[in-house]
Amino acid sequence: MQIDQTALAQAWRTLNADVTEIDLVAIGSPHASLTELQQIASLMGGRSCHARIDFVATVGRDVMAAAASDGTGEQLAQAGIRVIPDVCWCSITEPLFPPAARVLMTNSGKYAHYADGLCGRKVRFGSLRDCVEAAVTGAAKSHPPQWAQEVAPGNEATNG
C-alpha cells in the first residue's frame, strides 16, 4: 500500500463534513493529557468560547487533579471549557453529550472516524489549534491543512 498526497487529501475529506459551523469541540479520545490541557489554555490566550459552542475535554482523574493544582483547570473554566474525568468520547451519550450539538470538531482521528456512527452528528477534524480557533469563532476552516492538500499533476515530489 502506498500512501500519497491524494490518499491523505481523500482521508481528510472523509473525516470532514461539508459544513463549517460547529456546536461542540470534543477533545480527549483517548483522554487528553495535562500537556494538551495546558496547550489549550495557552492557545485560548484569555479568549472565551463562542456563545454557541460547548467545549469539553475528557481526561483521567490524575490529569484532572494536576490541572486543578497548576491552575490550568481554572484557566479552562474561565474560557468556558469543561473538563470531565473518567469518560471517553466513544462512550458518551446524551445528556452528557450536548443534545443540541449537531456538528462537532475534534483533534482525534479515532473519534472523527467513529463519531458519526456513535452519536449521529457531523464531524470536523483538525489540529488542536484548529479546534481552539473553531471554539472561539464558531466555525472550522473550510479548506484542508497543507498536509492534506492534493498536489497538481506534474508537481509531485520524487524520491531520489
Task: Locate predicted features.
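A glycine- and small/hydrophobic-rich beta-loop-beta segment
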Residues: 1-58
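Structural signal for hydrophobic packing residues in well-ordered secondary-structure cores
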Residues: 12, 16-19, 44, 48, ...
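Flexible, glycine/charged-enriched surface loops at secondary-structure junctions
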Residues: 19, 49-55, 86, 143-150
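Extended C-terminal subregions enriched in glycine
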Residues: 30-33, 48-97
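Predominant activation on well-ordered alpha-helical scaffold segments within soluble catalytic domains
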Residues: 38-41, 73, 77, 129-133
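Short amphipathic alpha-helical segments
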Residues: 38-39, 69-70, 117-118
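Extended, charge-rich low-complexity interaction segments
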Residues: 77-131
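Extended hydrophobic packing segments that form well-structured cores
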Residues: 112-160
